[in-house]
From Swiss-Prot:
Signal peptide (from-to): 1-20
InterPro entries noted in UniProt: Spider_toxin_CSTX_knottin, Spider_toxin_CSTX_Knottin_CS
Subcellular location(s) per record: Secreted
Keyword Disulfide bond recorded: yes
Pfam families: Toxin_35 (PF10530)
Protein source organism: Lycosa singoriensis (Wolf spider)
Keyword terms: Disulfide bond, Knottin, Secreted, Signal, Toxin
GO CC field: extracellular region
Stored PROSITE patterns: SPIDER_CSTX
Protein name (Swiss-Prot/TrEMBL): U1-lycotoxin-Ls1q
S-S bridge residues: C44-C59, C51-C68, C58-C86, C70-C84
Tissues in which the protein is found: Expressed by the venom gland.
Propeptide: 21-41
Phylogenetic placement of the source organism: Eukaryota, Metazoa, Ecdysozoa, Arthropoda, Chelicerata
Any GO molecular function: toxin activity
Length: 107
């Protein structure tokens, strides 16, 4: 009977050790993923900054990702150029206003 208890204890120890190794591997993968997301976040274009050369690189705002909004600018020479900046579209501003108002009332 004592041998059975020792074998069971040994098996439980081995199983718990192997599962903890698997969890450590998952945590390491998760950490690498978070570091990659942080790097992407650092490289994104902040609100009100120019995004003419990278129209999909705007950062995230409080609730939504900023959108690259473009306008045509006419210089004094009569040349037309496109200038873009990261900003919040009107429908996103309205949604953020409603959510903020709801948080004040129910929050």
């Amino acid at each position: 009977m004592m041998k059975v208890l020792v074998v069971v204890a040994l098996l439980v120890t081995l199983i718990s050790y192997s599962s903890s190794e698997g969890i450590d591997d998952l945590e390491a993968d998760e950490l690498l993923s978070l570091m990659a997301n942080e790097q992407t976040r650092k490289e994104c274009i902040p609100k009100h900054h120019e995004c003419t050369s990278n129209k999909h690189g705007c950062c995230r705002g409080n609730f939504f990702k900023y959108k690259c909004q473009c306008t045509t600018v006419v210089t004094q020479d009569g040349e037309q150029t496109e200038r873009c900046f990261c900003g919040t579209p009107p429908h996103h501003m309205a949604a953020e206003l409603v959510v903020g108002f709801g948080k004040k009332i129910f929050g």
